[in-house]
A protein has these predicted regions:
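Short, flexible, glycine/charge-rich loop motifs used to bind or transfer phosphoryl groups or to couple energy/partner
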Residues: 6-7, 12, 132-133, 193-194
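Residue-level marker of motif borders
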Residues: 13-15, 71, 169
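Hydrophobic faces of well-ordered beta-strands that scaffold small-molecule active sites
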Residues: 15-21, 80-82, 110-117, 141-145, ...
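Generic hydrophobic alpha-helical membrane-span motif
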Residues: 26, 81-82, 180
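Active-site gating loops and adjacent loop-to-helix segments of metal-dependent hydrolytic enzymes
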Residues: 26-61, 134, 139, 167, ...
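Active-site loop-helix segments enriched in His/Asp/Glu that coordinate
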Residues: 33, 51-140, 149-162
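Active-site core of metal-dependent hydrolases
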Residues: 120-124, 137-224
Length: 224
């Protein structure tokens, strides 16, 4: 079957779902960025956006997020989940804009859910307080996670699971992004989900390093 036929069928049935976006980053790349950044290591790329995050206003973020939502609507997308940075660099500007954009999304009949992005980690007390504040206020629909942003992925995930359980939220975790057999974050995430009793409420995002492992290891992780 032609995959585009399948896609068209889903759109006619009500639309498709974009379960992983970063709308606060939409329309922020420049041609110079593409020339200077494209070959940098992933961790370096996480810091490239800091300049924009410091200088952008809430209005800038709102404009970009709503433009991205409009674009998704044009592609026949029914629901979107976007990670939004919440950290001492961007402060509350991006999350405030995303909250405002929920009204825009509702007016245009497209679902919009927010996940926090822990780009500066969660072990930092300031970062943790900022994220928990917005969880307490009901601004975050899904607890987002980036274990590699912290010195201890184990401690990072323990905090993430405690927050998710406290506020009864699903978890979406960026894991194993480097296509490197030294990474075993997907396995760690699965073990933490079982340890915390949060099975069925956790999504592993990327997990491309699994493909760099031997078949027997991959099958062990698949079976967890």
């Amino acid at each position: 079957m032609d995959p585009f036929d399948t896609l068209e069928t889903k759109i006619r049935a009500g639309g498709v779902v974009n379960a992983h976006a970063h709308f606060d980053r939409a329309y922020t790349l420049t041609k110079q960025d593409m020339e200077n950044v494209v070959y940098k290591q992933l961790e370096e790329k996480w810091r490239v956006v800091d300049k924009y995050k410091r200088n952008a206003t809430t209005a800038d973020y709102y404009k970009n997020i709503t433009a991205a939502l409009s674009s998704q609507k044009g592609f026949g997308v029914k629901e979107c989940l976007s990670f939004i940075d919440i950290d001492p660099v961007v402060k509350d500007k991006a999350i405030t804009a995303a909250i405002q954009a929920k009204d825009f999304a509702a007016m245009h009949n497209i679902g919009f859910k927010i996940a926090c992005q822990t780009l500066k980690g969660i072990l930092n007390p300031t970062c943790r307080r900022m994220i928990e504040k917005h969880l307490e206020m009901g601004h975050i629909d899904v607890v987002g996670s980036l274990p590699a942003a912290d010195v201890s992925a184990v401690d990072h995930l323990d905090i993430i699971f405690r927050l998710a359980k406290k506020y009864n939220k699903r978890i979406h975790v960026h894991v194993d992004q480097l296509n490197d057999s030294r990474q075993k974050e997907t396995e760690l995430l699965a073990r933490k989900a079982m340890f915390h009793g949060w099975e069925g409420k956790v999504t592993a995002i990327h997990s491309i390093s699994l493909a760099a492992h031997p078949k027997h290891y991959r099958e062990k992780v698949y079976s967890m």
